[in-house]
Amino acid sequence: MAQQRRGGFKRRKKVDYIAANKIEYVDYKDTELLSRFVSERGKILPRRVTGTSAKNQRKVTXAIKRARVMALMPFVNED
């Protein structure tokens, strides 16, 4: 349900990136894909921000956690 705001524009519906690109298996070694779902501080972004479905969010979360344990992605990204 896109509601009109005072500015006169509608909110754009977020698209599930994984479903749109027909990705069957979210590989923990694909850090380029996983970095789309992680904030600049290293935290996993919620569904409401990324627009992924619940099923794909669980896949992404499990892959990010696995990549962190294997030292492919940082737990915390401090600047």
UniProtKB/Swiss-Prot annotation:
Binds as a heterodimer with protein bS6 to the central domain of the 16S rRNA, where it helps stabilize the platform of the 30S subunit. Part of the 30S ribosomal subunit. Forms a tight heterodimer with protein bS6. One of its GO terms (molecular function) is structural constituent of ribosome. One of its GO terms (biological process) is translation. NCBIfam families: S18. Gene3D superfamilies: Ribosomal protein S18 (4.10.640.10). Belongs to the bacterial ribosomal protein bS18 family. It comes from Streptococcus pneumoniae serotype 19F (strain G54). GO terms for cellular component: cytosolic small ribosomal subunit. PANTHER family: 30S RIBOSOMAL PROTEIN S18, SMALL RIBOSOMAL SUBUNIT PROTEIN BS18M. Keywords: Ribonucleoprotein, Ribosomal protein, RNA-binding, rRNA-binding. InterPro entries: Ribosomal_bS18, Ribosomal_bS18_CS, Ribosomal_bS18_sf. Disulfide bonds: none annotated. This is Small ribosomal subunit protein bS18.
